[in-house]
């Protein structure tokens, strides 16, 4: 099977990227760094902690990497997660923990929004961030 990176397509005008590749999210994003830096799209990822571990990375590493690219993190369930998400995503039951002690499921449907755009969210995201 032949694969290509996002960057290999040479896209120059991308507003939204959805990635749901059963644990391979880290590698898809790594292959799209130029696209992310040039286009600054909103990115939707489904992250499942056990799938991440299969590929030797942790969900919070991916989240931290996106924050380093100056993206804010938004959850459909919990709104903005800046400074809130602290899960190590290591436990066998794939549970994470929030600062306030609430447990969460191991799967996360997250939106990464460029910091410069977070006050002008696309309409489909405004439903999730109240």
Q: What is each stretch, according to the model?
A:
Residues 7-129:
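Conserved acidic-Pro-Pro-aromatic motif
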């Amino acid at each position: 099977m032949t694969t290509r990176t996002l960057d290999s397509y040479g896209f120059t005008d991308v507003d939204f990227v959805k990635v749901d590749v059963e644990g391979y999210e880290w590698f898809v994003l790594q292959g799209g760094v130029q696209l992310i830096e040039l286009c600054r799209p909103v990115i939707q990822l489904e992250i499942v902690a056990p799938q991440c571990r299969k590929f030797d990375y942790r969900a919070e590493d991916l989240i931290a990497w996106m924050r380093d690219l100056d993206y804010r993190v938004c959850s459909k369930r919990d709104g903005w997660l800046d400074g809130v998400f602290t899960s190590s995503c290591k436990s066998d039951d794939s549970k994470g923990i929030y600062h306030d002690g609430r447990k969460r499921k191991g799967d996360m449907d997250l939106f990464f929004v460029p910091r410069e755009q977070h006050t002008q969210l696309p309409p489909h995201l405004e439903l999730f961030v109240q």
